Every structure is written in C-alpha cells, then in structure tokens.
Amino acid sequence: LFISTRFGNVSQLHLVKTPGGARKQVTYFDEPIGSVTHQPNGELIAFTMDSGGSENAQIFKLNPNDGSYKLLTDGESRNGGPKWNKTGTKIAYRSNKRNGASNDVWIMSIDDPDSAEMILASPDGTSWGAIDWSNDSKKVLIQNYISITDSRVHIVDVETKEQRLVLGDPDKKSVNSGLGFDNNDEGIFYITDEFNEFNNLAYKNLDSGKISLITGDIKWDVDGFALSKDKKRAAFTVNENGFSSLYLLDINTYKYKKVSNIPIGLVGGINFNDQSKMLGLSINTHQSPSDSYTLELKRSPLSYGKLTRWTDSEVGGLDTSSFVTPELITYKSFDDLEIPAFVYAKDSDDPLPVIIYIHGGPEGQSRPGFSSTFQLWVDQLGAAVITPNVRGSNGYGKTYLGLDNGFNRENSVKDIGALLDWIDTQPNLDSSRVAVYGGSYGGYMV
C-alpha cells in the first residue's frame, strides 16, 4: 500500500507492506509531492510536485522499486491531474503550457515526453481537466468546472480532436461531475444536481441519451466515487450532515448497500486494487488524522468483509482518548431557518466560554474531522467550540447553498447573531464570554 505522509519537513511517498507494518520511504525530495496515481497493471507511479511553493506543478514518473524518476513536463508551466489510460502507456493531464494562463488538456506517452500533444485548448478562463480514458484509449472524458453550481462534461476524440458536450447545458446551470466510462464505453457515470436538491450519482447512455438516476433516494450529496477495475461494482461516499457514509454499488442492477463497519468520521481516497478484490480508503475521525484502510470485497458486488487498518498516524504524544466528540445540533435563525452546527465541549459544572469558528468559502462546510486546534481550545482554554454551517454552506442542498447570494449575503451574518441568541439559552455556555474566529470568508464574517 502506497501512502503519502510527512515525517520530516514535507510529505513524501512511503510503502507499507503489511497492516500496521513499518513504512519504507520511497521518495526523498526537498519539496512535498502532490497527487499520486499508480500505473494500471504496472509498477510505475505518476506524481506531481512543484518547486518553492510556486504552484507550477510538474508531472514525474517514478519507479518505486529503485527510486528512479523522470520529469515528464517542461519544468516551467503549471500541470496537474494525470490520468492513466487503461493499458498504462499514456497519461492525460491539464497544463497551461500554451500561454501560461489557460488550462488545456494534453496527452503523452509515458515513455516519450516529446510525444505530448494538446487535445483540447481551453476557450475561456474556466478550469478544464481529464477525468478518464475510454477502454480503447481513443477518447478522453473531460471536466469543465465553471463554478460550484455550474459544471459540464465533454468527450474528445484523441485523433481528430473533435469535442462533444455530453453533460450540462450552457443555458441552464447544473452540477455535472464526470466520473468515468463504463466497461463497454457505452455510457458514463457522473454526479449531478439536475434532478433534485442534492448531488446524485447517475449514469448516461451515450447513444440513446437515457439517464438513470441511481441515488435519488439518498437526500444528501454524493461526494466520492470509484469504479472497480473489472467494472462489476463501484463504491461511493455520501456526505450525510457532515459525516461520511460508504456504499457499494452493483453496476448491473444499480442496487447499492451501505458499508456498516466504517468508523464515524470522514471517508476519502476510495480506490480499488487491480484485482478488484479490495477497496482502499482513508478515514479521518475526531480522534485520528487520516489513516489508510482496506475493505475486503467478496464475490457478490454488494458483499464485503473485514475492514483493515494499515496505518496509525502519530499525533505528537497527544492523548486522543481525551478528545471530545463533536455533537451535531441545529438552531433557528432570524427567519426560522434551521442552521446546523457542531459543538465541541467537555462536561462542566460551570458555564463554559465559547469560541465560534466560521469556515471559509463561502460555500465551504465545517465537518467533524480531526482538529488538534479545536481540542486544544477545549482542553487548555476550557472553552466550548461551535462550528456553524451558516446559509450558503455546501452539503445541505442547492437551495441552502444559494441563500446568501447577492443582497442576501448579510443574512448569513445574521445566522451568527442567531447563534449568539442560542448560546444565551444554553445553561452550560457562558454568553458573556464569546470569541469569534475565522479566515478567508470566515474572516469577513468575523
């Protein structure tokens, strides 16, 4: 299992051969490595890394067996998002090499950097990037991100450079996040909010145009997806009121099942191994930073076995068993809108001072993950910490997301005023001692 972690000054790639085993460092760069993706049915790794915080990331290929590596991009432009084709011979990636500004999409033979060619020139200042290759490597699925409420998906023919819009509409805003081709290149899986309030998992047949809504019964956002290499099953994650749930999906029937043996927290980085018999994932809880796990998969697409923890991240000697568990609450704002928030507080005979932490964004979301800062405030300052998700926060539907747009911006500030009123009604909280903390948009709110 390859993991990215930081023992020295910056994050590097490590190899863990057994659950709980020692980590063998694979890379030794002065700069932190960025994204990492493994060659299908091969040994090479493609990864990104910039220099001196320039954010002009380059793409490298690495042989983890001997540590040898090679720069694939030009060393000057900004590059990212490498996606392997199914045979592991090429990558598609985004680059601003053409003019230093536009995010174009390029492809390259992994053995010949000089073969790099642009297959899509960005016509505007929006973000474009490769999502997936077709199984025959003749087409590339490409994401065009315009805003948090507007995104589209195109297919580009590698040889002719012909571009086809397959998801989204320039005249109607909707979220359309491409995920990948099916096993016959007949259709694509994607996430969309076109049909209801939330980001749903869906499938579109490319010939007929028929759309199958897969998770319409789940009234929360799907925020992660992985398709097994044999393309018989998939896994997806759902953001349920800030907490993550993991599901397995039968590709043939579109039936899905929640995985029950996942710790309460945040799940990310889901990915199947090449044999489609194991699902890798990272789990972050209020007591542990992100650690790597694997889920055993059985023959039936919806059957699974043991969850195995591979890493146990160090926390600098902190006693995480003393960390308080965040409690999900809601309170009413000035217009009776229910505002969700997480409360971190110890039991106390006396009312606790309060620190209100306001997230950035504005379309961000406070979630109950690992936070040594919040736990420090609770333990050392004796304070309660409240993290509200005021109107305009992501994760609660597109109507809620848009409630602070334009002249309604100050209504989100009023949500903090309503939180102060709520604090005043709580016997365990001291409304005369309240601090407000935030950065970026949260700083504006402060």
Located regions from the model:
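Multi-bladed beta-propeller domains
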Residues: V16-G34, G52, K61-R78, R98, ...
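Short, solvent-exposed loop/turn segments at conserved positions within beta-propeller repeat blades
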Residues: R6-S11, G52-A57, K97-N103, I146-S151, ...
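Blade-terminus and WD-like Trp-Asp/Gly-His loop motifs, strongest in beta-propeller folds
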Residues: L1, V36-L44, P82-K90, I131-V140, ...
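Serine-hydrolase catalytic core recognition
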Residues: G268-V446
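A generic tandem-repeat structural signature
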Residues: Q39-S102
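Beta-strand-rich domains and repeat architectures in extracellular enzymes and scaffolds
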Residues: L1-H14, V36-T37
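Short, low-complexity Ser/Thr-rich regulatory SLiMs
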Residues: S95-N96, T192, V343-D347
